[in-house]
Regions:
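Active-site and donor-binding regions of nucleotide-sugar-utilizing enzymes
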Residues: 1-67
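A donor-sugar binding/catalytic signature common to diverse glycosyltransferases
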Residues: 1-2, 9-12, 25, 50, ...
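Helix N-cap/beta->alpha junction signal
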Residues: 4, 54-55, 75, 174, ...
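A nucleotide-sugar donor-handling region in carbohydrate enzymes
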Residues: 46-122, 274
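Short acidic-hydrophobic, aromatic-tinged amphipathic segments that line or gate anion-handling sites
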Residues: 52, 72-74, 169-171, 223-228
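Donor-nucleotide binding loops and adjacent catalytic segments primarily
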Residues: 88-184
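C-terminal amphipathic helix plus adjacent low-complexity
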Residues: 240-284
Length: 284
């Protein structure tokens, strides 16, 4: 199971009741501004094998009572995708998604802030104001996810697109086009995890808005700001002074190889005999 989406809870519950062991990727992370946090931790407790993306997250899973011999720091699949997926050239991606030639651009993704009920609309409005004011950039905006409030976010962004000539809203770019777009972008803007994991590995600065990703390990190229137009604009200007230098906080790009090796070792035994016990850390 990957990550923290609501829909995986049902699959995990079914597997648990059928005594089918679960392997969980990207556990141990914190996103205090989203309900994903609770889902992720719940899946961790239902899982037998754990494949976190950093050493900090590995230790956190152990802190939750999972035995160290079942927890492996393997890095993030997002970094592996960057190192293995053949990218489009800048000219190709600009032509493909109709970004004006010669104009610097940003890739924007803004998801609902599910732990701050009633605040999503105002945060989207502030983002739109910032894009309107920082008109030296073209904004390639991908639609919000399926979280509660996602449709409203997309409606507000569609409304903004009718007004802003320097913005294009797309449903989805797919992995190859998305990573290619981020690679050549001046910066990434919004509150998506891709600004925390993939963008730094590509060397692209990120303006991370609000608390949705609060708690994640962040590279020096990630600039956090309040969800206010003035703060967003100041952070955008700050990216202009930052070098585009890759940062690999989330592994070396060999995640899948490591996972396959570990799974092969575990499946030498009959999984029906696997037992989970609570790993009790020494209390002081």
């Amino acid at each position: 199971m990957l990550g923290d989406r609501t829909e995986i809870l049902g699959m995990c519950a079914a597997a648990l009741n059928e005594h089918i062991p679960i392997a969980h990727l990207h556990g141990g992370e914190l996103t205090e501004g989203a309900v994903d946090d609770c889902i992720r931790h719940a899946v961790t407790k239902m899982s037998y094998l754990h494949f976190p993306a950093t050493e900090v997250y590995r230790r956190r899973i152990i802190q939750m009572g999972e035995a160290p011999e079942r927890v492996y720091n393997v890095g993030a699949l997002g970094v592996e995708n960057i190192l293995s997926v053949p990218m489009l050239s800048e000219e190709e991606i600009r032509k493909d998604v109709e970004i004006p030639a010669g104009m610097p651009y940003a890739v924007v993704t803004f998801h609902p802030v599910t732990m701050q009920p009633g605040e999503t609309e105002q945060q989207v409005r502030e983002l739109i104001v910032a894009m309107r004011e920082e008109k030296q950039y073209f904004y390639l905006v991908t639609k919000a996810n399926a979280d509660a409030g996602g449709r409203q976010v997309n409606a507000w962004l569609a409304e903004a697109q009718r007004e802003l000539t320097n913005m294009k809203l797309v449903s989805s770019l797919g992995m190859k086009r998305y990573l290619s777009a981020v690679k050549y972008a001046a910066f990434v803007l919004g509150n998506s995890s891709s600004g925390i994991i993939e963008a730094p590995a590509l060397g692209t600065p990120t303006v991370n808005i609000g608390d949705r990703q609060k708690g994640r390990l962040m590279a020096e190229t990630v600039i956090g700001c309040m969800p206010e137009a003035g703060a967003i604009q100041a952070a955008i200007r700050q990216t202009e002074q930052m070098p585009h230098r890759p940062s690999f906080l989330y592994g070396d790009g060999k995640t899948s190889q490591k996972i396959v090796k570990i799974l092969k070792e575990f499946f030498h035994t009959d999984y029906r005999h696997w037992k989970k016990t609570f790993y009790d850390m020494e209390c002081k």
